[in-house]
């Protein structure tokens, strides 16, 4: 995940609620909140190719929001969706790279 963030070529989406995203998120990620409307989700996906790899994450491995957003993406034709299971909690705990650890949007 650290490499993906540093390369900044793969879209990374935070599936948590907007208030959690605003509190802090993985550097370079955008919100694709579980509570957002279909229209809001489609707006966030503009310009992303259907075959481009997309990473989705949630709070932790016990959070199902990333699974629901991944299903939404697949249903809408995005074929290369992966879930970062450790989520924000793992990223923040490990602070993989202080320069790219956690940012506020």
Language model features with spans:
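Rhodanese-like catalytic fold shared by cysteine-dependent sulfurtransferases
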Residues: 22-56, 60-105
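Flexible, polar/low-complexity N-terminal or interdomain linker segments that lie immediately upstream
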Residues: 1-23, 99-105
């Amino acid at each position: 995940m650290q490499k993906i963030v540093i390369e900044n070529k793969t879209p990374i989406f935070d599936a948590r609620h907007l208030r959690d995203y605003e509190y802090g998120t993985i550097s370079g990620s955008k919100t694709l909140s579980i509570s957002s409307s279909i229209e809001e989700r489609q707006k966030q996906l503009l310009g992303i190719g259907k075959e481009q790899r997309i990473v989705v994450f949630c709070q932790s491995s016990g959070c199902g929001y990333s699974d629901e957003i991944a299903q939404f993406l697949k249903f809408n034709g995005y074929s290369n969706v992966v879930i970062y299971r450790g989520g924000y909690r793992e990223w923040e705990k490990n602070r993989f790279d202080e320069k790219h650890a956690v940012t506020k949007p």
